[in-house]
Amino acid sequence: MIKRQKLKYKWMLITTLITFTTILLFCLIIIFFLKDTLRSSEIDEAERSSNDIANLFHSKSLSDISALDLNASLENFQEILIYDDKGRKLIQTSNDNTLAYDNKIDFKHPERIHIQRSHGINYLVITEPIRSKDFSGYSVLVHSLQNYDNLVKSLYIVALAFGLIATIITAGVSYIFSSQITKPIVTMSNKMNQIRRDGFQNKLELTTNYEETDNLIDTFNEMMYQIEESFNQQRQFVEDASHELRTPLQIIQGHLNLIQRWGKKDPAVLEESLNISIEEVNRITKLVEELLLLTKDRVNHNVLECENVDVNSEIQSRVKSLQHLHPDYTFETHLATKPIQLKINRHQFEQLLLIFIDNAMKYDTEHKHIKIVTQLKNKMIMIDITDHGMGIPKADLEFIFDRFYRVDKSRARSQGGNGLGLSIAEKIVQLNGGMIQVESELQKYTTFKISFPVLN
């Protein structure tokens, strides 16, 4: 199992390593170029001295050249050795008696410029042949690289020290900066744990100096609001469903008890109890079907077969059927002169019409006059269904699409409603890209305005 690390320590470690590596590479590159430049300078200085010695032998004979003449051509930390053709050392002199070069020279295969190490010190050695009127031999210039090596070593030490100091500073700054970044995250984590303990009523009420964390806080609060709303709806749904199921089950239980006591001997009691029980079972079945319909999501809607439905024809068909079933009701229709096509599942549209018309009939038992209007307006299909019944109080308008909500609770059961019809209708409208508006005045009228976008 991978051990989890704190974000601020991980951030500090990563930034410190990157900084140290970058500085180290930068210093190494600089040292590389400095070494090359300094080494070229050392070689140039040694070659100048070697050339001066060669010119001295060309201008004077060996017997006229003194050690002082040779030393005048040398720089500090240089030594000159003169050999004859047989490799015998004739002259050895320098301006610095501390030089400790005593390596042998291979005159059979001499390298003009090479580096040799003697007594722990590197030397640049330049071997030049000397050909003059009275002398033939070799000059060997020994140039100490001790200062060069010490300088390069110092550069490495300075680079390492600079890298370490920069790393320590970076680590400190990184720690402070990462602490500032992770502080709101830690606060959010603590708040989330508090919300987990105390419930959804708490929200993250803090702001930071960073847009990303502020957006995260806003998103979290929005998510918590949706979760709380969903949780409350679920709890209300369970409570309401339990309440709605309790009454028919109690009725069925009561009539079964009647059958058990007297129904076996009294056919009238048996018949009445069975009819009422069947009616309540049908009510429960309808309630369960409506609950299942409400739990279906948009994915289920997408797999439904949609077709171009003639809105006016469907309304006329539904009105004709209802007119036969309810001859005491008057259905007034004002339909658009042009055909109106709506892409929707036909069964859903039929169910939508039945819900609104049935709802209008339930709450208009006095005038029994239902008005249906269709029109095309602003690229929208408008369907208005109006009844002249009891109306809806303004305080109830925002709740009428909630599950199990009834405006007239005393009459709802006798009218056979479960309080789910408008919730189902709203869902059908929303799933098909439409919207619903309600206008109502108490004891006068209620109009449901359903609108859908026109097909392209």
Swiss-Prot record:
UniProt catalytic activity: ATP + protein L-histidine = ADP + protein N-phospho-L-histidine
Gene Ontology MF annotations: ATP binding; phosphorelay sensor kinase activity
Transmembrane segments: 13-33, 157-177
Pfam families: ArlS_N, HATPase_c, HisKA
Domain of life per record: Bacteria
Residues where Phosphohistidine is found: 243
Major localization class: membrane
Enzyme class: transferase
Domain Histidine kinase stretches: 240-456
Processing after translation: Autophosphorylated.
Topology of this chain in the membrane: Multi-pass membrane protein
PROSITE patterns: HAMP, HIS_KIN
Enzyme Commission numbers on file: 2.7.13.3
Gene3D superfamilies reported in the protein's UniProt record: 1.10.287.130, 6.10.340.10, Histidine kinase-like ATPase, C-terminal domain
Family matches, as SMART domains: HATPase_c, HisKA
Subcellular location field: Cell membrane
Domain HAMP per the UniProt entry, residue ranges: 179-232
GO CC terms, sorted: plasma membrane
Keywords, alphabetical: ATP-binding, Cell membrane, Kinase, Membrane, Nucleotide-binding, Phosphoprotein, Transferase, Transmembrane, Transmembrane helix, Two-component regulatory system
Function: Member of the two-component regulatory system ArlS/ArlR. ArlS probably functions as a sensor protein kinase which is autophosphorylated at a histidine residue and transfers its phosphate group to ArlR.
Name of this chain's protein: Signal transduction histidine-protein kinase ArlS
Protein's organism: Staphylococcus epidermidis (strain ATCC 12228 / FDA PCI 1200)
Gene that specifies this protein: arlS
